[in-house]
Amino acid sequence: RWAAGDALEQWQNQVFLLQSELPEVALEQAREPLSFSLFSQPECVEQPERLAQVFALLVNAHYQTSPNDLFALLQDEAMTLFVAYQGEVCVGCVLAVREGELDAPTIEAIQLGTRRPKGHLTPVTLANQLGISQAARQSCWRILRIAVHPDCQRQGIGSQLLTHFIAQHHADYYATSFGVSEDLLPFWLANHFVPIKLGSHRDQASGCYSLLMVRGEHLDWLEQAKQQFSAHWIFELSDSLQALEPQIIQQLLPSTVALPQPLIPLELIERYARGGANYESVAVWLYAWLLATAPSLESLSPLLISKILQRKSWAACAEQFQLSGKRQVEQAVRTEILALLVNLQCKYTLPI
């Protein structure tokens, strides 16, 4: 640990901008119009006070921001910094990196697992894990960080930053990868990014699952990526993603592409909801039915997500939802299924 007032610690913090102060946004400044511009690497070097203000935003917004990010920002020609100002105060910034445009031999090596070129997370993931080589040939801007001044949050500045950044930085598509949470995901969904790859393990630093999202127009491969995402993450809900929070599942379900389903016996499901049959005999149909109807639902109850989609045990559900045991859990499941049937007013053709 540093001694109180240690001169070396003070020097280190000053050089690496680790304790730069965020200026307050005065009321008169908050009324000024926003201005958006590129903050180039030469400008970062020539204007250290301005750089310190921008980097303070990044440190404040992202706990993993480190001196390595500062070095990359100043040295990596593939990186860019885009800022928003109100008066003299930086109220938002986007840090992004250029990816893609890889040649055919490199893409083939990526798909065979023999190469993983540094600085190309999105195209490598798409080519290696989804088998989409076209995305690796195309150009991409990946958003590494986006930060908004604490005094100016919940005012749409982040969305405006993205809009202006995309307008001024052409690419075939745009991407972002982050530790998914119920607070962050709605922002990216609202800005027309779609999920295409959900990690199977929680990040040790953030404690969250990593989610890769993309945005682009006229992408021949995007529908394929969405279908693969839908099949993969739903399949993993009962295995590697069993601990994924129901609130995040609720937010992801509307992005799920409806996959072909067998004819679903709704009469059997309704009879179960009213007390007939047993859970094991209808579980497969409940699973297929929820997946078929999920894209049209505004929300799905955490209990149905946990029991039917994540296939948790009765005991685990009882503990999670503070119910006494299997009988009480199953009764709650039946009640919610019946309510869902009534609300949806399903019109499937039923087999006899």
What are these regions (language model features)?
Residues 83, 93-95, 142-147, 175-177, ...:
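Structured core elements
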